[in-house]
């Protein structure tokens, strides 16, 4: 036999030496039960690769990797991804730069992720851009961020993406409020991916504003107490779209940081050490691949 083609998942170690007559078990290639290598030693290096096609030519001892988009199952693709864009300041500090240099990547990187997600068939991205707690940062950093978010119109107005902003807009600078209104109006008819940007947003805030709205309607006779249920509460939340299937947080932290607290009840979480400015197509696909290997039960049992 002159060649052998393998379908394998991410390697558990970055480099393997395949010796003559060596058996490789599931510990090395997840999904491969046993692989017999009959010829001379070969070095396998696959750091950072996701599910790949490995072609071992046993005559030339040449090893080829080919990334394969078909590895993602279209039927198991998450419809809605929530994204916590963390690690921008650390990215800048690691490079000896001012923190603002890290923040500058937020809007272009978000646009890149939307473009990739659209091609993959993802319908909604909800991105956590500025929390209700971020006001505690220095005035200089807050002012920079809020001014930077005015770039959303230039970046997305002609992208085919529909943009919605959630959060307490009344506390934002008037110039940013006008930019938000213009962006939402300009893109509302777009049929592509729906990008929801959480700006001056917090899960506590969203739950409280929904509760106040329901109480006011009840006090004014617009609904009875018996009418209050989960579906009604969902309608009063600012997100107003299906709950996320997958939450991705970049930057290594493993918490939700007051993001979509109600909506994340049955969301699958994925945490990566990759800092947001470095988060790219392969990182997104790896997160989705991880998601597609999970068994979502929503509180039930299917043994």
Swiss-Prot record:
Its main location: plastid. PROSITE patterns: UPP_SYNTHASE. One of its GO terms (cellular component) is chloroplast stroma. InterPro entries: UPP_synth-like, UPP_synth-like_CS, UPP_synth-like_sf. It comes from the Eukaryota. This is Dimethylallylcistransferase CPT1, chloroplastic. The active site is at 86. One of its GO terms (biological process) is response to cold. It comes from Solanum lycopersicum (Tomato). It is an enzyme of class 2 (transferase). The lineage of its organism: Eukaryota, Viridiplantae, Streptophyta, Embryophyta, Tracheophyta. Uses dimethylallyl diphosphate and isopentenyl diphosphate to catalyze the cis-prenyl chain elongation and produce the 10 carbon product neryl diphosphate. Residues 1-54 form a transit peptide. Its EC number is 2.5.1.28. It is found in: Plastid, Chloroplast. Expressed in leaf trichomes and stem trichomes. Coiled coil: none annotated.
């Amino acid at each position: 036999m002159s060649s052998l083609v393998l379908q394998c998942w991410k390697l558990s170690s970055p480099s393997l030496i395949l010796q003559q007559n060596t058996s490789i078990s599931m510990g090395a290639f997840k999904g491969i039960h046993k692989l017999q290598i009959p010829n001379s030693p070969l070095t396998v290096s696959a750091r950072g690769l996701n599910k790949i096609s490995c072609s071992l030519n046993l005559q030339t001892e040449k090893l080829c990797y080919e990334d394969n988009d078909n590895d993602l199952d279209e039927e198991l693709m998450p419809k809605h991804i929530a994204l916590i864009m963390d690690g921008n300041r650390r990215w800048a500090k690691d490079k000896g730069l001012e923190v603002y240099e890290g923040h500058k990547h937020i809007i272009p990187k978000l646009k890149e992720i939307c473009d990739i997600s659209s091609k993959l068939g993802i319908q909604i991205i909800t991105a956590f851009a500025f929390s209700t707690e971020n006001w505690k940062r220095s005035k200089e950093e807050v002012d920079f961020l809020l001014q930077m978010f005015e770039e959303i119109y230039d970046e997305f107005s002609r992208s085919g993406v529909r943009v919605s902003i959630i959060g307490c807009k009344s506390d934002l600078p008037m110039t940013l409020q006008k930019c938000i209104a213009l962006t939402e109006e300009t893109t509302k008819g777009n049929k592509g991916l729906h990008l929801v940007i959480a700006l001056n947003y917090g899960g506590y805030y969203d739950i409280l504003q929904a509760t106040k709205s329901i109480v006011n309607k009840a006090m004014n006779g617009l609904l009875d107490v018996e009418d209050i249920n989960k579906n009604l509460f969902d309608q009063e939340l600012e997100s107003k779209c299906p709950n996320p299937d997958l939450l991705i947080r970049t930057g290594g932290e493993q918490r939700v940081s007051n993001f979509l607290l109600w909506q994340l009840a049955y969301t699958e979480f994925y945490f990566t050490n990759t800092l947001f400015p470095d988060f790219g197509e392969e990182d997104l696909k790896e997160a989705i691949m991880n998601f597609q290997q999970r068994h979502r039960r929503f509180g039930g049992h299917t043994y």
